[in-house]
Amino acid sequence: LPYFVKSEHNEALDDQYHGQNGPLNVAQLRHDNPFTRYFVEAGSKHYKTNDDFNGSDQEGVGVYQVTQKNGKRCSAAVAYLNPAKHRKNLTIMTDTVVDKINFKNLTAVSVKCITKNKVNELYAKKEILLCGGAYGSPTILQRSGIGNESFLQSHNIECLLDLKGVGENLQDHIDYITSHRVDSWELFAKPFKSLKFLSLIHI
């Protein structure tokens, strides 16, 4: 959480879960369909509203924030990589896959990676940040010997730390977005035509 707070520049929220001094911009949606407001209003009649899905509570009805700046996508690359890619103390390795992290007394000391079938080992001077995402990070930890001992042993991986939560508690939700161009802000585009169509349906 401290790294998330440090990275974030939230235009609206500033509390223990959010920061306003980082490069990754988080904003409210600039435009929303009127039906969105109708949906939230209807949902709030039967369930609690939530103005911050990245705060202490992730349940409720509301409109979520987006990683945008001035209406454009603000990704980690936009926030961090693009401004720093010309720095002399930064090396960007493409076509590279991290295999595992090497530990000494449970302190991360180096990273084994593969670049175009060539194995490299990169040594840390200060610290190693693992940013492989919901799938990549636990997988790298498991290959490095951190995870459920019985699972690691079944794959002939030496267990350095028996940590049963690694790779076993993925919780996700489906977010399916589809876009269509219509000539009306109404949900059914042309309400009267839709009503005429519905009148032809017999149950």
Q: What is each of the regions a protein language model found here?
A:
Residues 1-108, 177-201:
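Conserved redox-cofactor binding core of oxidoreductases
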Residues 101, 108-198:
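Glycine-rich loop(s) and the adjacent beta-strand/alpha-helix scaffold that form part
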